[in-house]
């Protein structure tokens, strides 16, 4: 490709409405342009990257034995009513009627459509297992689209759905998809983690997210320093302290704390170690518990994990924090003065709290705290559970190393759905015993457009994007200096250009009448991994300047060796 025949569309300035670096660089590098809120046109450079990501995904899905199909973006509302998600999904589901007043939706996902297809096409266990995938446009009417294509309304997604007659069969496909996803992101040279995750609104059993590590990520992910353990912070287990509870050294005593309504204020005013404080959070209880509220206790410097807490039998789902009015009506004190001593409602304490001694907590009297609280002596040890978020330095749940926490961008998610959709849509096959059997499902998604943005978040510098070779818009940029004045420079540039193209290398020959500084800046901005500079002075010594975008160092390569050098260094 020649720049004279290409739409480069680079920008010198960063658009004011671009928040994260990937959005800024995708606009400046001429990859995308905004059409409306959450809607983007992909320009040639962006589309080249998008297609590379798409092709890697397709190749690995094919290698894993998945079968490609294409399903409509527009879906009949009847299917969503039948599955029960018509009322569950909310305003993100764009609903409309056609000229015949028939209701439809723009598909945010395709569980209903694929299950409808299978219930009409597959009739016997002998035809299973099967795994179908598509790379298709999705639409979710996000209330606040942001971060460019990271959270847009229209996006390209690879979604796959597998069908089985047993959990064992599902597990085999699930493991194959896990391996395929790992291969996909490894081929793109991304630093990622596969983490245990919550199944969320889609439902089901086992679930893993594939997270690209990036400071701008919206998710906190946890992983071990010495093993492959990794999990979303919502699911990471906080292991009980190895050391047992220390002996009590203090007597229980009541302290006036009129100006200490938070842990931070208590610690500041009384110069307490925050590790010796406990905060008490009240949430709604289930009807079966016989109480209106449940108390959840975590150490002062720890955070309650709401997903873990919601799994406690007495805690109502969804987890709902009590209002100050409800707290006062039940306890007789405000939220800043709560604690376990003489508390008349069910109490659940975190594992770390259960191992504490001589700690401080509210006295259930406004403006007062107990200091020197000890379990069993001052209050019976209640139910103990893991209800907090892990913190850096915690012991890894697998016993190997300690935990680190980093931000991640979710680019893939795999689920074991079970029979949620097949039951709702009555998708059955004749089993080996001749009886109808409800199918078991898995679903597996990759946000193809989001992968592009995530790759930029992880691969950039002050000059622009640094693409991994596998997904770069071009492998090589050829920058001939003054080629319109030097026949020799032009001849060498054209010869190398044709040789590389003949070898299947994607080359961008910058044949514009531009200053060298502009040419260099544009190639660095769009992130071409390999650049060669051809000039008369170097040709006098039969050399060409080579520069790797990531490494940054310049090398002088003999003119007659440059093609072989590039072929040896390009990762395809």
From Swiss-Prot:
A GO biological-process term: prolyl-tRNA aminoacylation
EC number, as in UniProt: 6.1.1.15
A GO term for molecular function: aminoacyl-tRNA deacylase activity
Compartments (UniProt record): Cytoplasm
Domain of life: Bacteria
GO cellular component, as recorded: cytosol
Predominant localisation class: cytoplasm
Catalysed reactions listed for this entry: tRNA(Pro) + L-proline + ATP = L-prolyl-tRNA(Pro) + AMP + diphosphate
SUPFAM superfamilies to which the protein is assigned, alphabetical: Class II aaRS ABD-related, Class II aaRS and biotin synthetases, YbaK/ProRS associated domain
Entry-linked InterPro entries: aa-tRNA-synt_IIb (IPR002314), aa-tRNA-synth_II (IPR006195), aa-tRNA-synth_II/BPL/LPL (IPR045864), Anticodon-bd (IPR004154), Anticodon-bd_dom_sf (IPR036621), Pro-tRNA-ligase_IIa (IPR002316), Pro-tRNA-synth_IIa_bac-type (IPR004500), Pro-tRNA-Synthase_IIa_type1 (IPR023717)
Keywords noted in UniProt: Aminoacyl-tRNA synthetase, ATP-binding, Cytoplasm, Ligase, Nucleotide-binding, Protein biosynthesis
Record CDD domains: ProRS-INS, ProRS_anticodon_short, ProRS_core_prok
Family: Belongs to the class-II aminoacyl-tRNA synthetase family. ProS type 1 subfamily.
Complex and partners: Homodimer.
NCBIfam families: PRK09194.1, proS_fam_II
Primary role: Catalyzes the attachment of proline to tRNA(Pro) in a two-step reaction: proline is first activated by ATP to form Pro-AMP and then transferred to the acceptor end of tRNA(Pro). As ProRS can inadvertently accommodate and process non-cognate amino acids such as alanine and cysteine, to avoid such errors it has two additional distinct editing activities against alanine. One activity is designated as 'pretransfer' editing and involves the tRNA(Pro)-independent hydrolysis of activated Ala-AMP.
Domain commentary: Consists of three domains: the N-terminal catalytic domain, the editing domain and the C-terminal anticodon-binding domain.
PANTHER family named among the record's database cross-references: MITOCHONDRIAL RIBOSOME PROTEIN L39/PROLYL-TRNA LIGASE FAMILY MEMBER (PTHR42753), PROLINE--TRNA LIGASE (PTHR42753:SF2)
The protein, known as: Proline--tRNA ligase
The species this protein was found in: Pectobacterium carotovorum subsp. carotovorum (strain PC1)
Gene for this chain: proS
């Amino acid at each position: 490709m020649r720049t004279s025949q290409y739409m480069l569309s680079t920008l010198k300035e960063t658009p004011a409405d671009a928040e994260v670096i990937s959005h800024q660089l995708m606009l400046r590098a001429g990859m995308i342009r905004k059409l409306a809120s959450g809607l983007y046109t992909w320009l040639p450079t962006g589309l080249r990257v998008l297609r590379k990501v798409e092709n890697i995904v397709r190749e690995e899905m094919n290698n894993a034995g998945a079968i490609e199909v294409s399903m409509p973006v527009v879906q009949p509302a009847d299917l969503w009513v039948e599955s029960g998600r018509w009322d569950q999904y909310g305003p993100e589901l764009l609903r409309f009627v056609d000229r015949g007043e028939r209701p439809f939706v723009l598909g945010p996902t395709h569980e209903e459509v694929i299950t409808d297809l299978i219930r009409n096409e597959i009739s016997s266990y002998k035809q299973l297992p099967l795994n179908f995938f598509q790379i298709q446009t999705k639409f979710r009417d996000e209330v606040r689209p942001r971060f460019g294509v990271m959270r847009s309304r229209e996006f390209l997604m690879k979604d796959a759905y597998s069908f089985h007659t047993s959990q064992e069969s599902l597990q085999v496909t699930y493991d194959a998809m896990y391996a395929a996803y790992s291969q996909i992101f490894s081929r793109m040279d991304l630093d990622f983690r596969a983490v245990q995750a919550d199944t969320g609104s889609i439902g089901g059993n086992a679930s893993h997210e594939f997270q690209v590590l990036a400071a701008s990520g919206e998710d906190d992910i946890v992983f071990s320093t010495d093993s492959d353990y990794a999990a979303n912070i919502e699911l990471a287990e906080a292991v009980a302290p190895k050391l047992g509870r220390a002996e009590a050294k203090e007597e229980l005593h009541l302290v006036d704390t009129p100006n200490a309504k938070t842990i931070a204020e208590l610690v500041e005013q009384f110069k307490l170690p925050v590790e010796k404080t406990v905060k008490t959070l009240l949430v709604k209880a289930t009807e079966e518990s016989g109480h209106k509220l449940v108390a959840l206790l975590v150490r002062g410097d720890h955070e309650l994990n709401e997903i873990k807490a919601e799994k406690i039998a007495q805690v109502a789902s969804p987890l709902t924090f009590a209002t100050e009015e409800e707290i006062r009506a039940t306890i007789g004190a405000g939220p800043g003065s709560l604690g376990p001593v003489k508390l008349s409602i069910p109490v659940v304490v975190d594992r770390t709290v259960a191992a504490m001694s001589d700690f401080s907590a509210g006295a259930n009297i406004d403006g007062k705290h107990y200091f020197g609280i000890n379990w069993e002596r001052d209050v019976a040890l209640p139910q103990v559970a893991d209800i907090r978020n892990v913190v850096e330095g915690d012991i890894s749940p697998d016993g190997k190393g300690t935990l680190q926490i980093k931000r991640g961008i979710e680019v893939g998610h795999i689920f074991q759905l079970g029979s949620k959709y097949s039951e709702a849509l009555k998708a059955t096959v004749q089993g080996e015993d001749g009886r109808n059997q409800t199918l078991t499902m898995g679903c597996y998604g990759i946000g193809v457009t989001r992968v592009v943005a995530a790759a930029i978040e992880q691969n950039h510098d002050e000059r622009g994007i640094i693409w991994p070779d596998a997904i770069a818009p071009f492998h090589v940029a050829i920058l001939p200096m003054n080629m319109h004045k030097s026949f020799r420079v032009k001849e060498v540039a054209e010869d190398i250009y044709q040789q590389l193209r003949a070898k299947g290398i994607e080359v961008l020959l910058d044949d514009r009448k531009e200053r060298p500084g502009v040419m260099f800046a544009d190639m660095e901005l769009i992130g071409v991994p390999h650049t060669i500079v051809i000039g008369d002075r170097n040709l006098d010594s039969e050399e060409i300047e080579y520069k790797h975008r990531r490494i940054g160092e310049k090398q002088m390569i003999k003119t007659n060796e440059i093609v072989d050098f590039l072929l040896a260094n390009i990762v395809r």
